[in-house]
Amino acid sequence: MALPIEGKLSMANNRIERLKSPSSSSTCSMDEVLITSSNNSSSICLETMRQLPREGVSGQINIIKETAASSSSHAALFIKQDLYEHIDPLPAYPPSYDLVNPNKEVRFPIFGDTAPCPKSSLPPLYAPAVYELTLISLKLERLSPYEISSNRSWRNFIIEINSTQLNFYHIDESLTKHIRNYSSGETKSEKEDRIHSDLVHRSDQSQHLHHRLFTLPTRSASEFKKADQERISYRVKRDRSRYLTDEALYKSFTLQNARFGIPTDYTKKSFVLRMSCESEQFLLRFSHIDDMIDWSMYLSIGISVSLDLEVREYPDYRIVPRRRRRRRRRRRRRRHTHRSESSMGSFSQRFIRSNSRPDLIQRYSTGSSTNNNTTIRERSNTFTAGLLDHYCTGLSKTPTEALISSAASGESSDNSTLGSTRSLSGCSASRSIASRSLKFKIKNFFRPKNSSRTEKLHRLRSNSSNLNSVIETEEDDEHHESSGGDHPEPGVPVNTTIKVERPMHRNRAISMPQRQSLRRAISEEVVPIKFPNSTVGESVHSPSPIEHLSVDGCEIMLQSQNAVMKEELRSVASNLVANERDEASIRPKPQSSSIYLSGLAPNGESATDLSQSSRSLCLTNRDAEINDDESATETDEDENDGETDEYAGDDTNDDTDDSNIGYAYGSESDYSCLIEERIRNRRRASSTLSCFSNIPYGTDDIKWKPAIKEISRRRYLRDSLKCIKPFLDSNDCLGKVIYIPVSGPTFETSNKIHFSNRQSLQKQKNHFLKGFIVGPTALIELNCKNKNAIVGTTKDAEDHGEDDGDGDDGEDDDDDDDDDDDDDDDEDDDDDDDDDDDDDDDDDDGQITA
């Protein structure tokens, strides 16, 4: 029977009182716990720990603690460490890998063999992330965010990118001695200072300013051609130790926090990138567009790997070309409208200079303030339609029919410029306008003159354009159409000189003596002309205006021009068909347009109806080609802007060439060939989904494995330029982090400077850098406190600015201002700015103090 708890507690108290005596000896059984006191060497058996209930044990422990505290000998307490040592006295070691891992196939990295590496073993060789060099022209814009460069002239250098470092070297004279009249853009004094920079350093600023005042201006830097650039770059890469020396080093920059982009606000030079490195900002001009695109990729790689991983930002590349709205139809109408307006303006100005009719100046002058845009647009559309109408009619008629038509019009064509301009073709009108431009004159100034067929045709067009200086009013045009001047009257003999009655009741703005003097001047300039394909064996002479009414000289000249153009276009079309259809052994002889049309016409149809049908056929073909061009998805994607047209090459006349080929009249096989070619072009330009309907049933080769469509060079250049971000000179750098070269600490572990015989730290490849934040008035030192806050704020501001300025947010607006960000540098002949200071202090560049 178990004793109650109160009895057990009383027994424990009795034992404690008995053990307090120093002479008593205590013995404990095996099931008792022995605790040693630190005050004396006697063993005190406090309590026999038997199997008691949980509440009994806790009560006994409390009693023991209170008794020990009240005792004078300060008995030892129950300590956990002693208990753990009593329970597990031996040290515990981790188990072996064999016991823990029963699967022998799984192997853990056990670094048991820590033998030192031999001294002969070398680390792997260093390979830069990117290394390339080329020839460029450099123009320094800013020495610091607060200081504009005084010397803004172009200078030629060798640029080298070595992973995260950008170096500029002077070009050795042996590399450019084959280039005639070469100039590096460096003054003679700068060259002497560079040569003697190892011995003499001009640290006095006053001496430098005095020297700059008496420096003669130098010539502008020569522009490298693509062949010269490739040849010199190859020689430098082959012998870098000779040309890329420390003495030839101009400046060295780090790519940490560097920026670059297309300077859309700079239009004087082509193939230019604006770059900001350390504290300076400069322009880089490349020799050709391929070099510019490649170096934009090299700079992006170097900037991305320049910073450490913990401070490196996520790259924000523009890997997809910027989206453009498809406005081909609208821009096509604008282009034709502007071209027509310019043509109308040139004709009206020539009329004002020659005839001085004040009643038509106010009516047809494009510069008049009374004419609004709607009237000009309607007038230009009428003018374009008249050109196409008369051009198609002139090609379809024989020379005799054209003579009859011009004679039937009579006096109505003498007083009209709009009616006479209808005899000009669209191709000849555009070429005559282009020939009068300044660029065309400069291009053909040094070209040797030859007596070829092209030169004769050009002189013929120029004579016709000089003669064609008469304007017809709208009332005269309506009266002329009502009188049927374009259609010959039946029964008129061909081989005789035609006399036409003057139409009555016509409002004439020029008196009869003036008209006769004008006609006499025109007839004197016209020479006897014989039509090339005329069936009549007589030549048309310019009769005297005294004997009888003569045929208008403008009509004769323009009809002969149409005949020559018809022969030229027919020969071009025949050559094209011969090249495309080599399998045809025998080709039918090209026939005349009138003979071919007469053969196609049914019985009972007149020649006038044939000309009408041919004219409608020509206009229909032109409309079909315009619709085909508008429906093409490849060419409709982007439009010609200033940047893309200049960099993409001279491929802007493809549509006009195709349309001119379509107007050439020849044999029946020519039409079938042109139709087949148009169908092939339309299928090739359409999308893959639209071509599924043309694939026969059961054919899986084309449907599931379509042919790879190679991208054209023009589209490659256009998309590459769109992927480069713009960089304006007014881009605010406030709050951005820049690095400035400073003198580093003198530690034994610091890398030694390779070439220390220079005062400027930017002229040393190995220099220390220190981060600063661009403040409103001065630079702020970058430390750990403001680094994260400023960098995070700057990044948010950049993201916000890009979201506001980008046009790709999904808004489908119709303004064309969003395309201006991608416009690159337009080609211009200006070499430099108007600044005359050509000297630059090489020793003071890069020394910026906060």
From Swiss-Prot:
Compositionally biased tracts (Basic and acidic residues): 479-489
Cellular compartments annotated: Cytoplasm
Compositionally skewed regions (Low complexity) per UniProt: 406-416
Biased composition (Acidic residues): 626-658, 799-850
Major localisation: cytoplasm
Comp. bias (Basic residues): 324-338
Keyword Cytoplasm: yes
InterPro entries: PH-like_dom_sf
Keywords: Cytoplasm
Region listing for Disordered, in residue ranges: 324-348, 406-428, 451-494, 583-659, 793-850
UniProt key word Cytoplasm: yes
GO CC entries: cytoplasm; cytosol
Polar residues: bias regions: 417-428, 605-619
PH domain: residues covered: 194-306
Misc note: Present with 172 molecules/cell in log phase SD medium.
Protein name, entry field: PH domain-containing protein YHR131C
Species of provenance: Saccharomyces cerevisiae (strain ATCC 204508 / S288c) (Baker's yeast)
